Amino acid sequence: MCSIMGYCSRNAVLSSFMEGFQKTISRGPDDSRVVETGDGILGFHRLAIMGLTPSGMQPFRLGNSYVVCNGEIYGFEKLKKELSVKYTFESNSDCEILLPMYREYGTDMFAMLDAEFACILYDGEAGEFIAARDPIGIRPLYYGYDKDHAIIFASEPQNLTGLTDRIMPFPPGHYYKKGQFICYCDIAKVHRVCYDDLETACGKIHDKLVAGVEKRLIADAKVGFLLSGGLDSSLVCAIAAKKSSEPIKTFAIGMSEDAIDLKYARQVADYIGSDHTEVYMTPDEVLSSLKNVIQLLGTYDITTIRASIGMYLVCKAIHNQTDIRVLLTGEISDELFGYKYTDFAPDGKAFQEESQKRVRELHMYDVLRADRCISVNSLEARVPFGDLDFVKYVMALDPELKLNTYGKGKYLLRHAFEQGGYLPDTILWREKAAFSDAVGHSMVDYLKEYAESQYTDEEFKSRCERYTYARPFTKESLLYREIFETFYPGQAEMVVDFWMPNKTWKGCNVNDPSARVLSNYGDSGK
């Protein structure tokens, strides 16, 4: 990961800019550079992944124009070759192609990128700033306005505290130009339903996911894998193991006493022959990391915080004990193929609408968790299930095909990898367990018990009434909200709401986001 920031005003004060910008130096500890354009300021903290030499340092410049980008552009070599007819390149960095692309295609370039990215571009000819974000929002970007109504962009909300009154997430699939946010790609929108039959669909799911993993293995820095033992991360690791000439490095975390997933992660690691490391966390580590995790996340959402603690601690161990710089993860599968609660979807139309909602909100929940927990430890997250070609195909599939009418959730994904010896059946057909549950049921229980000890019933009721937006409804949610407000006072609207199952569906009217409370959880936690 890298950190970018742009203050789009001639009146921008460098010292104020730097005060905010330095808060995210852990995203890019290798080098830093700030450029004053005359119309504003651009800043870049570098984590070198592609093009490791100093020539790959940003901001890149072309004439009087500059760009900073936190991103990974897949297949950039082809674009670079085409552009090389007119432009000279000085590095092997994928992001160096952005300014030549902008000169050739303008803002149409953003729809041409197979990438996860957030970028801020200064057009020196027009004297204006342009910003953009990938269609899913895998790479973070936030914005706000200063007292003179000048816009400021930054990788994380903490960069903007003190500079703007209101901080908002930059909408994925949009670019900003001349005061407007313009959608260039709504990846959740289906223009034409795909009616491939089951076997054809599963064949394409297989091929597209394999391609999504394979392209994310390319890096000039060392690559590792988060392995929870669940279906999604296990598939990513299994595909990578088949594509790698040497054993891949996998990492799992759990509570020292009852981590469900550690044993399954170990089974996967043994099966695929990975170089596997287990990290154990204690109740004290869980509680002592809580404030730090909420600060780095910039959220008060219950399930995001629960699931982030284990991820934060395992990434911290990877940073401290290895020279790995890139981590592949298993996020985004649930939004495409279904959660435990989507088994209750009344019909295909309802399933599809729920999937679209979840994909459009990913940048506030699972994707946010993966970015922050990994980047704060000076690592880069790559998410194969977020491959644009893969997401577009699965979203376009006939919703009736994706409904759980097979007696097993995520059937299409499981069936797609049933052949080829990717995983043992015990993993491939294992029931889903939420990550925050599976790293140890007791972790969630520790958090709940701690929250219960912080408030009497009377205190809980009175303190909840302080909040009109996304009002806390349990002592745990109140604890998280109060910690959030100490770091981001008055910024609750950065998050659209608490992540919860669709309460309008039969069987889903619950008051906890964990799948454990659903009637169909069954053997998931065993």
Segments predicted by a language model, with ranges:
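Peripheral terminal appendages
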Residues: 156-158, 199-200, 208, 212-223, ...
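Mid-to-C-terminal catalytic subdomains of enzymes
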Residues: 92, 324-329, 333-353, 361-472
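ATP-dependent adenylate-handling ligase core
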Residues: 257-315, 321, 338-352, 372, ...
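Amphipathic alpha-helical segments that form well-ordered structural scaffolds
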Residues: 97, 208, 268, 393, ...
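Hydrophobic (often cysteine-bearing) scaffold residues that line and stabilize catalytic clefts
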Residues: 13, 91-94, 113, 198-205, ...
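Short, amphipathic alpha-helical segments that act as regulatory/interfacial helices
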Residues: 6, 313-319, 395, 414, ...
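Cysteine-centered catalytic environments shared across enzyme families
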Residues: 1-299, 321, 325
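Short coil/turn segments at secondary-structure boundaries
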Residues: 33-36, 111-115, 166-170, 218-223, ...
